[in-house]
């Protein structure tokens, strides 16, 4: 791109020497002719690994430079400003800032260059490529930028007409540098051309005046908000002052401007929380409204007075039999009214609860009990045998047991211990990278603060009727129960059949008006079918625009952010309106008692500039103490502190705690948080948090041979992101019949010995089901000869994901074990069910055998619900619980019956 006479012959550039050394490459232009120019620019851009800044949203079809902002900076005299031109300093400073916004060390910027009037004259645009190393020096970058511009100026004799084609891909932002001597008409014509192109969203016009630099920004407010543009100018000025002052390591640069620091401090200046115990807040509601309904369950109801009485009675019994403050007491119940009594009694006894899910493998629940060093536990009668294998004393909770306690127990024989709000309230286990679950330790004040935040944000009250839908092993279940009781509302407990099979009708029957759902589950519910619902909180996975469009006009819709280590819920945003569908990634601000910091992803000792993506670090009372008996994991995730913290004299209650979330976020213009992605091995799939390393460890433990496994989340070809699946890649080596296969290529079934594969892995799913919950078991197994590796010798996970994503669900299933040795159908019921599977899953009939699992051939938990609904319409009864427990076609045929 050019302006003024002869400019088309001069729009060219060189790849800057990224190491700072000047080599023979600098003379390449002298040897180029017109025919070689296109090839040169192709090689110049080849291998670019960065991103373009700014990213233009899909919704913005044309950029319009209607916004304006100004900034001035005075550069002092120094050795740097003497040796290098101000133009080189500006270009280098802009590249450094762009590297922060794009999270990349590979940066291409487009800048202008004024040609000498005695030559061709005019102003040209040319690309400059920087490779920025943290251990490199700023003077090396300055030297490279200056040498590159000098070479462009010295190559005026060449005519390179294709340069514009290589400028355009990087022209979302343009850096214009002009001097007082530059002809104004040249620059104005260039600005007119940029505006007319409707491709550029940000133009920085830097005027080099006698004693200062004046920067004028032209921008598209749809792409870069006015406030953020001002921040960009502040940040650029802050960088320019540093690199113009003296030579320094890139890693020592401070990218956080003084203005950024002030704003971050202001956003974190929230009032401190008041320390409280969870059970004390609930007891207060019982005292004020003893006749109000606290629990409305399929197996019975409790008023607040009854809940308080039963919990106090059970707490006294727990103390009497030896439960001490600080003990961990597991609970294992089907969905029941007694769960609420159990956890409240444990808290009143001074102990901490550990909620378990009976649908998880017994071995996993027993492992958690052992990790919690549990001596006492509460369970329902059907669940008691599971816990008795790991816990010495298991109390079977029931109405008759509680009535017996009332007869035997003298009133007020045992008093609940007076608890410090900093005492442990519960232990919540999540997936762990070591192959075993790890438990986050949460205090009373932590979850009391989180509950207060939810209550205030969503206007919970005594009229709230909350659906207790989430698994007991999921932090959302604790929110559903405790936040509701803190607000004086009613916890609605459905049976597993009601919850999994016909949740909408059940919500109406129980008059549910508040619910938490993952986006995946929310897609299975029609808002018109739940007219009683007033508030929907959604989280656990990315909230996409379709959720906002579907629900925002029917309910008050909120997005939720949190994890086990952050009291399960640390921030909320909403209520969202339908026009905010493009802002669905915003998760709001942390609740009182929690500060939000964003650090550079690979350099947590430095804060990220406002607007740049970084790792979220949370600080304060909402943060867990750490992981039980996991010293290394605790040290990695819960650092003691950061040097930058002293820059912010914010309120702190005693010793503070930090948690590195592993989530990549950015500050929005108003200081709220926008979720971007995960940065480590943790993923969330349909609301469930999963550590891929735990699955890989379990696969190695149960496989018959010491093969290598790699588990990844893959979005199959033709599917949307919410249809992602877990795929276990396995390196079989000698199991292949074709030893010449490319190691990074996806194999076909003919390329390996399926008999060996079945012999090695045929029992894996069954063994995994003994230790992992269903949502952690891979849907497909993907055979390879060897894993592709990166230059550093690590498994090239990206290659695995990309190549598997080129295959449809059907192709993945064919490649996996599900296609081996299909059994013929034997009954009319099997044939009927196969026809339903075909319609629901979109697979051919001959793809389904009697021994095929619904989940292996394309089903998932949400499609299981649709299967139940379809069968019910046809007059058959097969609930979701049965589908999950017995998923093969033949098993379903045996369990399916006619409706009464």
UniProtKB/Swiss-Prot annotation:
- Residue positions, PTM O-(pantetheine 4'-phosphoryl)serine: 861
GO cellular component terms, alphabetically, are: cytoplasm
Pathway where this protein functions: Mycotoxin biosynthesis
MF terms (GO), sorted A to Z: isomerase activity; ligase activity; phosphopantetheine binding
- One of its Pfam families is PP-binding
The domain section of the record reads: NRP synthetases are composed of discrete domains (adenylation (A), thiolation (T) or peptidyl carrier protein (PCP) and condensation (C) domains) which when grouped together are referred to as a single module. Each module is responsible for the recognition (via the A domain) and incorporation of a single amino acid into the growing peptide product. Thus, an NRP synthetase is generally composed of one or more modules and can terminate in a thioesterase domain (TE) that releases the newly synthesized peptide from the enzyme.
Q: Which residues form the Carrier domain?
A: 824-900
What does this gene product do?
Nonribosomal peptide synthetase; part of the gene clusters that mediate the biosynthesis of AM-toxins, host-selective toxins (HSTs) causing Alternaria blotch on apple, a worldwide distributed disease. AM-toxins are cyclic depsipeptides containing the 3 residues 2-hydroxy-isovaleric acid (2-HIV), dehydroalanine, L-alanine which are common for all 3 AM-toxins I to III. The fourth precursor is L-alpha-amino-methoxyphenyl-valeric acid (L-Amv) for AM-toxin I, L-alpha-amino-phenyl-valeric acid (L-Apv) for AM-toxin II, and L-alpha-amino-hydroxyphenyl-valeric acid (L-Ahv) for AM-toxin III.
> What are the entry keywords?
Isomerase, Ligase, Phosphopantetheine, Phosphoprotein, Virulence
Q: Which family does it belong to?
A: Belongs to the NRP synthetase family.
Q: What is this protein called?
A: Nonribosomal peptide synthetase AMT10
Q: Which GO terms describe its biological process?
A: amino acid activation for nonribosomal peptide biosynthetic process; secondary metabolite biosynthetic process
Quote the record's miscellaneous comment: Gene clusters encoding host-selective toxins (HSTs) are localized on conditionally dispensable chromosomes (CDCs), also called supernumerary chromosomes, where they are present in multiple copies. The CDCs are not essential for saprophytic growth but controls host-selective pathogenicity.
Reported EC number(s) for this entry are 6.3.2.-
CDD domains attached to this UniProt entry: A_NRPS_SidN3_like
Induction remarks: Expression is up-regulated more than 10 fold in toxin producing cultures.
Q: Domain of life, per the record? A: Eukaryota
> What InterPro entries would the database entry show?
AA_adenyl_dom, ACP-like_sf, AMP-bd_C_sf, AMP-binding_CS, AMP-dep_synth/lig_dom, ANL_N_sf, PP-bd_ACP
